[in-house]
Amino acid sequence: MTFLPLKSPLKFYAVVPTADWVERMVEAGADTVQLRCKALHGDELKREIARCVAACQGSHTQLFINDHWREAIEAGAYGVHLGQEDMDTADLAAIAAAGLRLGLSTHSVAELDRALSVHPSYIASGAIFPTTTKQMPTAPQGLDKLREYVKQAGGTPVVAIGGIDLNNARAVLATGVSSLAAVRAVTKAANPEAVVKAFQALWDG
């Protein structure tokens, strides 16, 4: 099983909770956005995902849907992002057959090995620094471990996530990761659009 490669580098990767936020990120020119929506179910969730897909059409923003792979396939989303536990329950073959890209979360060498075995479009590694966004199963990985994960991943793009902000972004990029993901650095910012542009400028300088 192999998943399609990314059409373009992920670069700055905003993780947001609603379609409203996805629309804002597209308007701000974000390279990549993930809908991580835990509050909606059923038809409401389907409508939310459909809004996200519509918002990204005609833009360069790559859209990933967290967890909800069936709805993502139905809506024609660009990709799906799954956690380690989701690998046991999601129909990975169906996701691949539908032509969706796949990203997988990893928190250790063993999880990275497992993720790489299904040839995903990218892997996410974290949490790099302490984070209050979600309860993490492992201690923060730190930059030295992240550097090793990048080597282990070989040609598979690595997204760093967890406690990343504009103060530490350059140090994280220096490990060789191809993308920086941010949650609170965007959603809690006074001016999220300016934060997006500041992150994306890291790849231009």
Curated annotation (Swiss-Prot):
A GO term, aspect molecular function: thiamine-phosphate diphosphorylase activity
Keyword Transferase attributed: yes
A Gene Ontology cellular-component term: cytoplasm
Chain sites annotated for binding 4-amino-2-methyl-5-(diphosphooxymethyl)pyrimidine: 34-38, 66, 105, 134
Pathway, per record: Cofactor biosynthesis; thiamine diphosphate biosynthesis; thiamine phosphate from 4-amino-2-methyl-5-diphosphomethylpyrimidine and 4-methyl-5-(2-phosphoethyl)-thiazole: step 1/1
Entry note: cofactor: Binds 1 Mg(2+) ion per subunit.
Binding site for 2-[(2R,5Z)-2-carboxy-4-methylthiazol-5(2H)-ylidene]ethyl phosphate: 131-133, 163
Obligatory cofactor(s): Mg(2+)
SUPFAM superfamilies: Thiamin phosphate synthase (SSF51391)
UniProt KW Nucleotide-binding keyword: no
Keyword line: Magnesium, Metal-binding, Thiamine biosynthesis, Transferase
Superkingdom of the organism of origin: Bacteria
Protein known as: Thiamine-phosphate synthase
Species per Swiss-Prot/TrEMBL record: Neisseria meningitidis serogroup A / serotype 4A (strain DSM 15465 / Z2491)
